[in-house]
């Protein structure tokens, strides 16, 4: 029987929470990102494919929340299913993904401000200016200090952010419907295209041809990371089981919320194809919706969207500042990281995790000055790494299905995992390889945790750590030598990577000795 929690949240409210929580900054740049990769027909097919894959993930998460209530979070599923090392890889990846997403927010926020002061905050190649780096650094440290004071969950802030987010999007949908031209939308609907660009990367023209199956596959492949990025955080949809009035409501809300998000995203990504040509959309610049609404209704529309986006991003950035440290705190509680990471201040905030994360964020905020198209670089990094976490969720359900001999769980878990793995293979493996540099840092801390808790790494863990660390080192050389086209795929060169790696090594050594000292104070010897 489905017991009722009288103080719980009803179905409609659950759906609203899921939708408002999932819509972040990525949706504001969705239209032009997709236009650079796909024609309208390709976008439609891509949404069908991605929607089905995300549905399988949500169903997997929802089943685990209801049937494994003793487990908490994505990394805990990986640990329960495949051991401590895999649980650590998932949790550390979640940490990495969350702060990479924050950097993407920072870049997008400054491109919004650049709408009012063209050329001041963003360079033509998509990198941030020195002034922008200074501004986002101040904002980032300010948000970290706010979270350390325990204000990340203020209801008033969330309400303001929700209004600032939804009003411009509603205006955009209305304007998109009013200005929609069927002839513009249907032109080249099912055709393949080749973009002819100048030295600055601006599309001068598109050359059209009849689309083949391979062409359509290429368009879907090119849209994968952009579309999955706007669903990053969807795991929160399945974590509502203990807050729902009925447990069955959590499952229904997950499905209804996903459908609502798909409708919103499809409208926002397809309506512009009925107002501008694909070439014009691809060249609108960042953030896409700001420039498109400006073209639709005039300057007031662009200003409304830009202001709404800045407020929305600040709110999302504030919430996401806590996400990475929640991951490291949980790893500490599970004894997969040293207890140093779980230490709380008098406000209940994990101060050490916050400061370490902010130091690493600061390093990569500086990198945004050197990286062309910085927004997409960090979007891809964030999305690629979290897809590993999502794949492990599906694999855990698949494993449970085999153990319980439940066919539905076997099928759902397999599809959820296969979708994430295939999407990574076709679109993001280069970023996973690059992320191994940061995993190498994590493995050092994982070993320290083992020391603190009086255990040793197993032979399998030592071998896995060695292999993954070597691959991380090879990634550095791979970028320098442009192995397998890494520089083109990642959008960074060797010198830019050096800007990040050198201070990262310094921070790693500092943290290592601080944590080691903390462990030794407890009387734990080698």
Curated annotation (Swiss-Prot):
One BP annotation, GO: amino acid transport
Signal peptide residue numbers: none
Transferase found in the keyword field: no
Segments passing through the bilayer: 8-28, 41-61, 88-108, 128-148, 160-180, 220-240, 255-275, 297-317, 354-374, 378-398, 407-427, 428-448, 466-486, 495-515
Gene Ontology terms, MF aspect: antiporter activity
Superkingdom field: Bacteria
Phenotype of gene-disrupted mutants: Deletion results in loss of the growth advantage observed in the presence of high L-arginine in different growth media.
Reactions that this protein is recorded to catalyse: L-ornithine(in) + L-arginine(out) = L-ornithine(out) + L-arginine(in)
One GO cellular component term noted in the UniProt record for this chain: plasma membrane
InterPro entries: AA/rel_permease1 (IPR002293), Amino_acid_antiprt (IPR004754), APC_superfamily (IPR050367)
Keyword terms of this UniProt record: Amino-acid transport, Antiport, Cell membrane, Membrane, Transmembrane, Transmembrane helix, Transport
Protein topology in the membrane: Multi-pass membrane protein
Subcellular location, record wording: Cell membrane
Family to which this protein belongs: Belongs to the amino acid-polyamine-organocation (APC) superfamily. Basic amino acid/polyamine antiporter (APA) (TC 2.A.3.2) family.
Protein purpose: Catalyzes electroneutral exchange between L-arginine and L-ornithine. Can also efficiently translocate L-histidine and L-lysine. ArcD1 is the main L-arginine/L-ornithine exchanger in the arginine deiminase (ADI) pathway.
UniProt protein name: Arginine/ornithine antiporter ArcD1
Organism: Lactococcus lactis subsp. cremoris (strain MG1363)
